[in-house]
């Protein structure tokens, strides 16, 4: 069993029931929701690893636009989960748009259970890798800002900082600090 929490969002109760039965055999926890608006509290908690998101919800238009809008909304949050889009009306353009908007994968109803599980696992790994890369980039920017700030210090400021660092290391012991600074 994989230690992941999966959310299934679909307006068809039969689809929710079948997916829950299928996925609870493989994943630690499954949450089913009948509309994406019910997913909002889970975004702030950040505990969902992946979402299977239907493309159409109670809309007369079955073009997937509603699903794409919800995809954008979910992916716009920090630490957004991996998303696998699902629709009965799949086409290449819809799949490409989903991937361009941040979905990790796309699957068409009726689905193959093994294929869906593989896609979810791959999506979780891909999303985790993307999150790690994002964190590393943020850390690099922070380090660069710190280095630039240090480079802008005057010589006197650098000396003062060095003396303060030594004093901190010596826990305020002036004799020890003077010795380390080679002051007689």
Residue ranges and their predicted role:
Residues 13-31:
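Two-component/phosphorelay signaling modules centered on CheY-like receiver
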Residues 32-50:
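Acidic, metal-coordinating helix/loop segments flanking the phosphotransfer/catalytic sites
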Residues 148-184:
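Bacterial C-terminal helix-turn-helix
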Residues 62-79:
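Short amphipathic alpha-helix used as the core "switch/output" element in two-component signaling
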Residues 120-136:
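The C-terminal output helix
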Residues 110-120:
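C-terminal output helix
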């Amino acid at each position: 069993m994989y230690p992941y929490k999966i959310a299934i969002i679909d307006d068809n109760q039969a689809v929710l029931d079948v997916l829950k039965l299928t996925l609870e055999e493989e994943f630690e926890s499954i949450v089913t929701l009948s509309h994406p608006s019910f997913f909002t509290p889970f975004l702030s908690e950040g505990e969902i690893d992946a979402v299977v998101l239907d493309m159409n919800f109670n809309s007369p238009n079955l073009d997937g636009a509603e699903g794409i809008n919800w995809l954008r909304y979910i992916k716009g949050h920090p630490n957004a989960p991996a998303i696998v889009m699902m629709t009965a009306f799949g086409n290449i353009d819809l799949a490409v748009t989903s991937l361009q908007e941040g979905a990790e994968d796309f699957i068409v109803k009726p689905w193959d259970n093994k294929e869906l599980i593989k896609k979810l696992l791959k999506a979780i790994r891909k999303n985790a890798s993307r999150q790690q890369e994002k964190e590393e980039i943020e850390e690099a920017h922070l380090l660069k800002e710190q280095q630039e700030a240090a480079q802008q210090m005057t010589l006197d400021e650098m000396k003062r900082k060095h003396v303060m660092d030594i004093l901190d290391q010596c826990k305020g012991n002036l004799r020890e600090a003077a010795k380390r600074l080679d002051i007689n």
